[in-house]
Amino acid sequence: MIITLKLEGAFGSFDRASEDWYRLIEIESNADLETLHLCIQDAVNFENDHLYEFFIANSVRSSAKRRFDNENQGLWEYSIGDLFPLPKHKKLFYLFDYGDSWYFRITKSRKKIEQEEAG
């Protein structure tokens, strides 16, 4: 089943001028987090040249996090469908580039990506 995810700038290298920035991503619910990472890289035109992680927490700055990365595993063991619905008050975040700290919040969306009409 294909689900739509909304990717929003959450913290770090995003400035206040980009508060309403977002991207929608359509992806199979059985796709693993590595596949989601590659979709995000494509959606934001990054070059996949830095380390990254996903984590579930109340906020970006929460000390209590459930992490998914190369060291803690989880990138290939969990599908997107395994993570949603998230526990109450929890959010899914994606951190790319520990130096520049690009933080994104990922939520399920009911909005679908509009297809461009051929013309």
Language-model features: where?
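Short linear regulatory motifs enriched in tryptophan with gly/pro/ser
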Residues: 1-119
